[in-house]
Amino acid sequence: MPLICLEGASGVGKSTTAHEIAKLTNAYIIPEVNFLFERPSVESNTWYLERQVERWMMAQDKLKTYDTVILDGDIFHPFSYNWCFNFKIFNQNLELIANFYRKALKEYKIGFPEKYFYLYSDKETIRERKDNDLTRKRRNFEKHLGIVDSYTKYYNSLNEFLPQYVHFVEANKVEENVKMILGNLNSTTNLTTPYSTEFLEEIINWLANNKA
């Protein structure tokens, strides 16, 4: 029973695609942190990281009863997102984030999904979809659109360490996204364990030595 993650720019169609997969198959969706949890008035610099651990635990529980569990948004999101802003936001530098994940991984409180599916499209198409979607308000949309190239670069880098670990899906139509994802759901990768400390260290080293 695979645990997969859908990633991509805000507005590209991750949640819509995930919900369509759930309609067609026995799949459960773990929403992103901002949809699952109410943010406290005073937030520690590890609050968001701790919620990612909770998402992982939820996913492990749902894998007992569902054929597929979909992480709508990466549980390692603090790495990619903060890197795009040179680790100068949220009072979270690379060392803090890295040490948090090192500890959580060694304690089996968090791990890597079996495969990523990264949805992408050109910026104008993403902007049009956002304007046509009246169901959600997307805060800082233009700011997030501005980091798309760096964001994509990060997920490309994961394939340098684990070839074919991230499957890139050109997000033209939802039904095509679904077909592509379901067709590659059980394809193998070189990830031998979700708790790979070696893979984590490769990611941390790459982040430390590459600029967004």
Predicted regions and their residues:
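P-loop (Walker A) phosphate-binding loop of NTP-binding proteins
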Residues: 9
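Hydrophobic anchor at the beta1->P-loop junction of P-loop NTPases
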Residues: 6
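Pre-Walker A (Motif I) flank of P-loop NTPase domains
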Residues: 1-3
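Loop/turn-to-beta-strand initiation segments
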Residues: 65-69
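Conserved substrate/cofactor phosphate-moiety recognition/catalytic segment
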Residues: 19-64
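NTP-dependent small-molecule kinase module
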Residues: 134-137, 142-212
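Conserved lysine of the Walker
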Residues: 14
